[in-house]
From Swiss-Prot:
Keyword Cell division: yes
Keyword ATP-binding: no
Name of the protein in its database record: Septin-11
Pfam families the UniProt entry points to: Septin
Main subcellular localisation: cytoplasm
Coiled coil location: 320-410
Modified residues (N-acetylalanine): A2
Organism of origin: Bos taurus (Bovine)
Domain Septin-type G: from-to ranges: 38-304
Name of the encoding gene: SEPTIN11
Oligomer and partners: Septins polymerize into heterooligomeric protein complexes that form filaments, and can associate with cellular membranes, actin filaments and microtubules. Forms homooligomers. GTPase activity is required for filament formation. Interacts with SEPTIN7, SEPTIN9 and SEPTIN12.
One MF term in the entry's GO annotations: GTP binding
Amino acid sequence: MAVAVGRPSNEELRNLSLSGHVGFDSLPDQLVNKSTSQGFCFNILCVGETGIGKSTLMDTLFNTKFESDPATHNEPGVRLKARSYELQESNVRLKLTIVDTVGFGDQINKDDSYKPIVEYIDAQFEAYLQEELKIKRSLFNYHDTRIHACLYFIAPTGHSLKSLDLVTMKKLDSKVNIIPIIAKADTIAKNELHKFKSKIMSELVSNGVQIYQFPTDEETVAEINATMSVHLPFAVVGSTEEVKIGNKMAKARQYPWGVVQVENENHCDFVKLREMLIRVNMEDLREQTHTRHYELYRRCKLEEMGFKDTDPDSKPFSLQETYEAKRNEFLGELQKKEEEMRQMFVMRVKEKEAELKEAEKELHEKFDLLKRTHQEEKKKVEDKKKELEEEVNNFQKKKAAAQLLQSQAQQSGAQQTKKDKDKKN
C-alpha cells in the first residue's frame, strides 16, 4: 500500500538568520576539491571527410601532438576510431577521448554513412545505461565514453552544404551537441566566407537541424556566448607549425602570398572556437549530454521496457506501481506460456500414443502374416516329406522285388546247369 508523503512548498520555507558561523559556506570549495581530485573527462567526436584537417585541429586546440595514422580514401565503409589521453593543466587532470570518423564521405554510395556514427553514440549511451541499472553501481570509477561535443567539419566549398552533411547532422542533432565549423577557412576569400556562413545557417534552420546553443541564461557567460553565437559556424584554420612574425613565434600557415595566423581573430575563428568549446562551455556540454541527449535515450529505452511516468489516463505512476504492473504482466505472460506448453505437451503425448498404437498394429499385422507364411511353408515341407517317404517305400518295394527275381533267376540257372551235366554223364 502506497503512502503519500507531502513535500514542503516554497511558501512553507522560512528564511532564518544565523547567530554565528556554521561552515557550510565551504561547500563550493569542497565541491571544487572533490572534482579536482577525481579529474574530468571530455569526449569529442570529429565528423568530416578524409583529409579535411580533423587531426591537425585537435592538435592545435589542445596544444599537443596526438597520435594519428595517415588517412586514405580507400576505406570500404565508415568506421569510428577512439583514442583516449590523459592531459594535465596546472592541477587539473582531463581524460580526453577523441573519436574520428575514418572513411566518412569516401564511398560512392553515401546514403548510410551516418549509421555507424549513430550506432557508436547509441552504444556509449547503452553502456552508461547498463551501468546505471546495475544493482551495485560504480559510476564513480566508470569511464564515461558518451560524446559531449560533435565538431562537424564542413568542406570550404563556398556554395552550400552537401546533402550528406544535412542528412548526417539531422540524424545526430537529437543525440549529440553539434558545433558546425568550416574547415580550411584560409582557402575562401573573406567576403565569400561571410556569405557561406549565412548560407549554412539558413540551410540548417530550413532543414530543422538543431545545433548546440551556447547558454545565455547564466550571467557569467551570457554576454560572451551571445556575442560568439553570431559567428557560427566557426571558420577555422589548424596548424602546429610555428612561424616567426615580427619578434614572436606564432602558430600559422605560411603561403607564398603571406601568413595565416591561427590565433589571430582577424584571420580565422580558431580562438572563438577554443573559447566556446573549452574555456567557457565545456561543463555545459557535459551537462547537456547527460540531461538532454542521454535522458532522451534513457527515456525511450525504459519506455520500450514498459516503464513510464504516467498511466494511459496521464496520471503519475510511481516506480512501485510500475514494478507491480510489470510483475503482474510478467506473471500473466508466464501463466499463459505455461498453459500453452501444457496443452502442447498433452497434444504431443496424444500424437505419440497414436503413433505407438499404429506401430503396434503394423507389428501385429506383420506377425500374423509371418505366422501364416510359416504355417504354409511348414505344410509344404510336410507334404514334400510324405511324398519322399512314399517314393522311398516304393523304391524299397521295387528293390525287394528285383532282388527276389534275381535270386529266383540264379537258382533256376543253377538247376539247369546241373541237369545239363547229368545228361552228359
